[in-house]
Amino acid sequence: MLAEICEHFVDHAEVFRDGDHVTLSSEIGEAYISKVSEQLDITLACSTEDMLSMTRGIIAEHLFMFAGDDPLTLEWADQPKPEKLANLSEITVVSAENVTPRMRRLTVSCTDTARFDTSEGLHVRLLMPPKGREPIWPVTLADGRIGWPEGEDEIAVRYYTIRSIDLERREMAIDFVVHDDCGRRMPGAEFGLTAQPGDRAALLGPGAGGMPDARDLLLAGDETALPAIARMIELATPEMKIHAIIEVADKAEEQALACAAKDFSIEWLHRNGAEPGTAKLLEPAIAARLETLGPETFVWAACEKTEAQAIRARLKESGLDRTRMSSITYWRRGHTD
């Protein structure tokens, strides 16, 4: 199972293997997994209880997935009690508007917006219940997995970025890329397009995807990463240096982004008719700037899987220290997950 763990998580974390010992390191924490006899010994280290709960759930879900039909027993030293998820917050849609022709923004109300007001975790899992049904929210199971409602109560889950937060009004904005993937159902885009004031949903998080701890940032991504890039740009302080490279469909998708950093620049790349995930514009644009990076520049990129892999390979090839880079898969062409 160690081989499956390494193969799967390489797109989501830094993976290190030394014989029967594997370390997974990401923005939300670290997992140390060792094979001892016929068992796996797992130790998790995260900065917050919410991130620990999220990491435990992710590890548990994947271990059961890798086990398939084989029996698996998973026990934790601090066995979680079956109960409502501690990091779940219900939200209600307040309004919807088009930011650009292909980007739609939902403003939602939430009673505990303050816990999302952090630069350490910009992302959440959006839980979208079936329309017309009273939501049944998931619970924590004793083995660490999340117990999801099934059948007619099944919930669609997708990752999104909190675009902005209004603590006084207890409201948050979430941006949705509006697209159709060759006729495949896209639950997130569908929710963004059809949500009406009063509609209910929920958020799990905040979790992975914090702002890098650096004063010099090279940020790159396609439109799926634009909300995260925009949030980081707007969180910047005056002494920072930021250059952003953003791939979008065309000029109509460009957005005006405010930044307090005195040294700020942005480069828009247009696909001009090419399908998302096929233009391959980001990797060469990043490569063109590698020789001019400062000694403390952190390179952050997020996009379609194949390009994220190409960017990661190019950064490693350039000799950039792994602690100064992050290239993340945000989506996979041909998949709706």
Task: Show the residue positions of the predicted features.
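Extended, composition-driven regions rather than compact fold-specific motifs
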Residues: M1-D337
